[in-house]
Amino acid sequence: MRLAKYFFIAAACLLQGCGTPYATMKKRMGEDVMLLGHDPVAYFTEKQSLRGDPAIKTSLPGRTYYFMSEENRQRFLAAPESYEPQFGGFCSSGAAFAIKLGSDPTEWEIVNGKLYIFGDILGHEAWRLDRDANISHAEASWSEARDVGWRWQSLKRVSFRVPWYKTGADIRREFAAKYPRRKWPDYDVGSKIQNYFSKDPGWRAREGHGPQPVVGFVGEDACPPACPRTSSSPFSVK
């Protein structure tokens, strides 16, 4: 069974590629951009998800960041480790299970001076159920996942789960027990084909999948909404 699973993962990666090691979206000119072009520094200074300007950018191996201002770019260059999102910008909830999948720049949180991004509101809510344990698990697993393409790593760890893995049903039960008066968000995550094979991380936010507001990809998509130096809106729980 294990051999069959590895064969499937290898075949999938041969057909679609193993994915990038960071949660990037590729521009038509080939640039791999983080956070759909949102400014990583603005999360700290403005406490908002704000789009950067493609003309004000800096590149690190495998990823490029846009900034609202030259001042923010210089802040980043002085200490990139202080501003880069944890776990390659992938969903911090999935990272707790050594999975690199999903990235929504409008779902974020800063804890102890570190920026955590989530794939969607469901990942964010799941992570909050046991924030410290999820951070600890993700940090312990990151050496395994850091340099691996997201598709390969996610398919591997969905097939061969870490001992502390939780299913969606497990998480919903925990949520109901902790918040008996709250409803689990009604959010469409898309299909497995879309999330694992046909789309890049961040696609749901970019396209406005289901009830998700269209965030767009600054420098690539129409303005509005994807205008430089503007804020972007997250999915709103009704």
Map each language-model feature to its residues:
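Beta-edge loop/turn motif
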Residues: S69-N72, D120
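Sec-dependent signal peptide recognition
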Residues: R2-I9
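Short, well-structured hydrophobic secondary-structure segments
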Residues: P61-S69
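Generic detector of N-terminal low-structure segments
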Residues: I9-A10, V237
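Intrinsically disordered, low-complexity terminal tails and linkers in eukaryotic proteins, enriched
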Residues: C18-P61, S82-K238
